[in-house]
UniProtKB/Swiss-Prot annotation:
GO terms for cellular component: cytosolic large ribosomal subunit. The lineage of its organism: Bacteria, Pseudomonadati, Acidobacteriota, Terriglobia, Terriglobales. Keywords: Ribonucleoprotein, Ribosomal protein. Residues 123-141 have a biased composition (Basic and acidic residues). It comes from the Bacteria. PANTHER family: LARGE RIBOSOMAL SUBUNIT PROTEIN BL17M, RIBOSOMAL PROTEIN L17. This is Large ribosomal subunit protein bL17. The gene is rplQ. Belongs to the bacterial ribosomal protein bL17 family. The keyword Ribosomal protein applies. The keyword Ribonucleoprotein applies.
């Protein structure tokens, strides 16, 4: 029986599980949206929510506690300057877990874990990627046109 055995083991030993969750939480705070398995998303949710609550406090002690958990200083800066102010009047529930299908190898259920209110930033990132893709496509078409023009200028049979 699993009475009073809360939490997720994730098939790992303690240090590996702790490292995995710290990395996942850091990625969520840096990227706003991460795809992972549903179990890992559910395991990471309370950690992210506690860190956002620390970020809302905003004092030095909270910053040091966040720095002790997160992997990078950039993540701490982003947490306190960008992420936490979004949720000033909200008491918890900062994340959304959206199921996204199944993993190919082992059939594990995948999910996106994302911060609420990050839709605008995610749309901007998506639009920027689309513009970069379009620019690359235009450059490729231009290069192909130049190449065809160069090939078209030469005699096809050569000098025989």
């Amino acid at each position: 029986m699993r009475h009073r055995n809360a939490g997720y083991k994730l098939g790992r030993n303690t240090s590996h599980r702790r490292a995995l969750l710290r990395n996942l939480v850091t990625s969520i705070l840096m990227e706003d949206r991460v795809e992972t398995t549903i179990t890992k998303a559910k395991a990471a949710r309370p950690h992210v929510e506690k860190l956002i609550t620390l970020g809302k406090k905003g004092d030095v002690h909270s910053r040091r506690q966040a720095l002790a958990y997160l992997q990078t200083r950039e993540a701490v800066t982003r947490l306190f300057d960008t992420v936490a102010p979004r949720y000033g009047d909200r008491n918890g529930g900062y994340l959304r877990i959206v199921r996204s299908g199944f993993q190919r190898g082992d059939g594990a259920e995948k999910a996106f874990i994302e911060l609420l209110g990050a839709e605008q930033e995610l749309d901007e990132k998506r639009q920027k990627r689309a513009e970069a893709r379009a620019k690359r496509r235009e450059e490729m078409q231009k290069a192909m046109a130049e190449q065809q023009q160069a090939e078209g200028g030469e005699p096809e049979g050569g000098n025989e």
